[in-house]
C-alpha cells in the first residue's frame, strides 16, 4: 500500500491508498493509481500542449485549458473516459447509465488556479494527473461538512503522477 497526504483544515494525515472517502463529505471521493501506459500518457501530454489555451481563461480554470470535448476527437481521451465510466459504475453499485459529457486537459503554471465551483448535475467528475510537480497545490474540496459543532471544513488531497481522482 502507498500512502498519500491529505489535510483537513490545518491537520495533515497520511492515508492508505487507494482510498475511498465515504459520503460523510457529501459525496464519495475515490483516489487510485491508474497505471496508464507511458505511451498513452505521453500522447495525452502532447495533445494537451498542442491545443494550448482554447478557453482563454474564461472558465473556472484560470490556466491553459483545451476544448471541452477532447474525448470525441482523440482515442486517448476516449479510452480514459471509458475507464472512468466503468469505474464510476463499480463505485456507485447501482445499475445506472453513465456517459462522459465533457473531457478536457489543462496545464497549470505557478500562480494559476481553478476557482471554487460545483459540478451540479453531474453524478461523477474526475481528474487524471499526468504530471505533478513537487510543489503543486492540493486538490481542495470546500465545505465538506463534518467540522466541529456543525461547521464545514475543507479537505485537501495531494495527488501524484498517474493518480485518478473521482468525486
Task: Identify the meaning behind each predicted range.
Residues 98-167:
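Catalytic core of non-heme Fe(II) oxygenases with the double-stranded beta-helix
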Amino acid at each position: 500500500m502507498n500512502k498519500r497526504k491529505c489535510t483537513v483544515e490545518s491537520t495533515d494525515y497520511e492515508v492508505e491508498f487507494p482510498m475511498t472517502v465515504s459520503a460523510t463529505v457529501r459525496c464519495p471521493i475515490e483516489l487510485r493509481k491508474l497505471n496508464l501506459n507511458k505511451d498513452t500518457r505521453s500522447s495525452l501530454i502532447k495533445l494537451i500542449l498542442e491545443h494550448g489555451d482554447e478557453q482563454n481563461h474564461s472558465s473556472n480554470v484560470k490556466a491553459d485549458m483545451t476544448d471541452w470535448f477532447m474525448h470525441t476527437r482523440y482515442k486517448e481521451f476516449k479510452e480514459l473516459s471509458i475507464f472512468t465510466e466503468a469505474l464510476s459504475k463499480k463505485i456507485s453499485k447501482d445499475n445506472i447509465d453513465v456517459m462522459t459529457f465533457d473531457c478536457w486537459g489543462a496545464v497549470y503554471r505557478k500562480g494559476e488556479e481553478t476557482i471554487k465551483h460545483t459540478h451540479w448535475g453531474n453524478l461523477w467528475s474526475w481528474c487524471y494527473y499526468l504530471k505533478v510537480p513537487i510543489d503543486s497545490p492540493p486538490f481542495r474540496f470546500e465545505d465538506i461538512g463534518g467540522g466541529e459543532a456543525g461547521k464545514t471544513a475543507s479537505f485537501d488531497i495531494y495527488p501524484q503522477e498517474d493518480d485518478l481522482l473521482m468525486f
